[in-house]
């Protein structure tokens, strides 16, 4: 069985996350996708929004998709959240399955900065998506041993949404509608998230 792994701060989870993951699941035949909110990203630092809100938003975003599940693996571990540690734990749990690590091409470009990138590539195939129309040129593939044979790049659709820009817009009174799943937009509005907090 192929299992997709998709991690991030999800602050907030938005259509630029959900739609490419749906495309990946269909294209690569992923029987399950595990969504893993990070406690603290080593490259980003602590997210501005409390984990309980980020978890609630991911739960709402994936509701209705029984093949998409929410994991607390990184939230339950002491920070920071290293992908290689998460993949190591998952590979021990799913011994007979093939792990596929899903990420944007922006994250792929920085793969060499990750902890033990060669082990990341050994533990999981990489499926990297563009969030805008892909013309097939200009993609910088990092020099990581084994990556060339373990990498699939695909068009994630025209969903170029930045969580940072979204938070900034919401802080200025903007609406989340049209950029996040409907239930997530309602949650953001109900709990007045991101109001007056830019970045």
Per-range role (PLM):
Residues 1-199:
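Nucleotidyltransferase catalytic core that binds NTPs
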């Amino acid at each position: 069985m192929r299992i997709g792994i998709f991690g991030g701060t999800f602050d907030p989870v938005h259509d630029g996350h959900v739609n490419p993951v749906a495309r990946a699941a269909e294209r690569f035949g992923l029987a399950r996708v595990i969504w893993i909110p990070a406690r603290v990203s080593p490259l980003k630092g602590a997210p501005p929004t409390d984990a309980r809100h980020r978890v609630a938003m991911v739960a709402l975003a994936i509701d209705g998709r029984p093949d998409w599940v929410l994991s607390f693996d990184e939230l339950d571990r002491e920070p920071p959240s290293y992908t290689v540690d998460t993949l190591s734990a998952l590979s021990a749990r799913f011994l007979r399955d093939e792990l596929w690590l899903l990420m944007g091409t922006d994250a792929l470009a920085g793969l060499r900065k990750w902890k033990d990138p060669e082990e990341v590539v050994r533990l999981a195939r990489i499926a990297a998506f563009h969030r805008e129309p892909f013309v097939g040129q200009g993609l910088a593939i990092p020099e990581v041993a084994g990556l060339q044979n373990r990498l699939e790049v695909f068009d994630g659709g025209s969903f170029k949404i930045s969580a940072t820009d979204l938070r900034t817009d919401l802080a200025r009174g903007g609406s989340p509608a049209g950029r996040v799943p409907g239930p997530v937009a309602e949650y953001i509005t109900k709990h007045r998230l991101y109001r007056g907090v830019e970045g």
